């Protein structure tokens, strides 16, 4: 199975998975027009849509796509029940599409019911993990988002992370502001700048890389605590995570 990246809106990515039979799966269609263009160009037959959460920039294309392909099956969390989901799924559920098994992970934080879809080595995590960053957190859900990061942290290191947006340069600039002497982040920023100048994407990323350059995966780091003016002996890493995200919100 192969994957096509479909950039839409200003920063969104829709993901199109397809097989040798020209059957395809669409993940988080924030709009329909460009997806329909891809389907027409490659003569793909849409079999399923996967939704990670209910924000409009991830679901707005569902209804138009269903109009064109009425037999399409839609999988999503409970919060997407009014946006076309036929099967409401959560952690513990798995299913097979195009002969590939997908495992559902609960990843609350960006929204209360946010989920991800894992099909080794791919993770489609919506707006949970971004390269060098994390999604905005709904009020009161910082600890849940931290726990979602922990869940992702323990996936295989070769996991490819497919995020819902292209935010990497902003994220890596923030990471440098927190850890200005970190050589891994400095090197990564230099790489990202080159990619941006060439108008090339930075997603997907890998879990192995994110564990090195993403401060939200490194909340036990004493230099991060120092940068946030937090006690070095603070044990609750989710509190570090929360302060880090607050700092990013005002960056």
UniProtKB/Swiss-Prot annotation:
Cofactor binding summary note: Binds 2 Zn(2+) ions per subunit.
SMART domains: Lactamase_B
The keyword Zinc is annotated on this UniProt entry: yes
Pathway: Secondary metabolite metabolism; methylglyoxal degradation; (R)-lactate from methylglyoxal: step 2/2
Keywords assigned: Hydrolase, Metal-binding, Zinc
Annotated residues for binding of Zn(2+) 2: 57-58, 127, 165
SUPFAM superfamilies named in the record: Metallo-hydrolase/oxidoreductase
Catalysis: reaction(s): an S-(2-hydroxyacyl)glutathione + H2O = a 2-hydroxy carboxylate + glutathione + H(+)
GO biological process: methylglyoxal catabolic process to D-lactate via S-lactoyl-glutathione
Pfam families named among the record's database cross-references: HAGH_C (PF16123), Lactamase_B (PF00753)
Cofactor section: Zn(2+)
Amino acids binding Zn(2+) 1: 53, 55, 110, 127
Top-level EC class: hydrolase
Function (record text): Thiolesterase that catalyzes the hydrolysis of S-D-lactoyl-glutathione to form glutathione and D-lactic acid.
Family, as annotated: Belongs to the metallo-beta-lactamase superfamily. Glyoxalase II family.
Protein name: Hydroxyacylglutathione hydrolase
Origin species: Blochmanniella pennsylvanica (strain BPEN)
Gene behind this protein: gloB
């Amino acid at each position: 199975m192969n994957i096509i990246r479909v950039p839409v809106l200003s920063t969104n990515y829709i993901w199109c998975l397809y097989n040798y039979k020209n059957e395809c799966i669409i993940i988080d269609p924030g709009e329909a027009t460009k997806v329909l263009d891809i389907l027409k160009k490659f003569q793909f037959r849409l079999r399923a849509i996967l939704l990670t959460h209910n924000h409009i920039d991830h679901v707005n294309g569902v209804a138009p796509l269903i109009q064109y392909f009425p037999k399409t099956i839609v999988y999503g969390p409970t919060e997407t029940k009014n946006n076309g989901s036929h099967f409401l799924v959560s952690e513990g559920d798995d299913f097979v599409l195009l002969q590939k098994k997908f495992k559902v992970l609960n990843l609350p934080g960006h929204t209360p019911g946010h989920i991800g879809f894992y099909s080794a080595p791919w993770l489609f995590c919506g707006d949970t993990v971004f390269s060098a960053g994390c999604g905005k957190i709904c009020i009161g859900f910082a600890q849940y988002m931290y726990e979602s990061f922990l869940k992702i942290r323990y996936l295989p290191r070769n996991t490819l992370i497919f995020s819902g947006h292209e935010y990497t340069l902003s994220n890596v600039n923030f990471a440098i502001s927190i850890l200005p002497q970190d050589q891994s982040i400095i090197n990564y920023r230099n790489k990202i700048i080159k990619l941006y100048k060439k108008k090339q994407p930075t997603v997907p990323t890998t879990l192995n890389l994110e564990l090195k350059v993403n401060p939200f995966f490194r909340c036990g780091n004493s230099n991060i605590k120092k940068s946030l003016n937090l006690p070095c002996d603070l044990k609750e890493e989710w509190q570090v995570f929360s302060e880090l995200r607050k700092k990013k919100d005002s960056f």
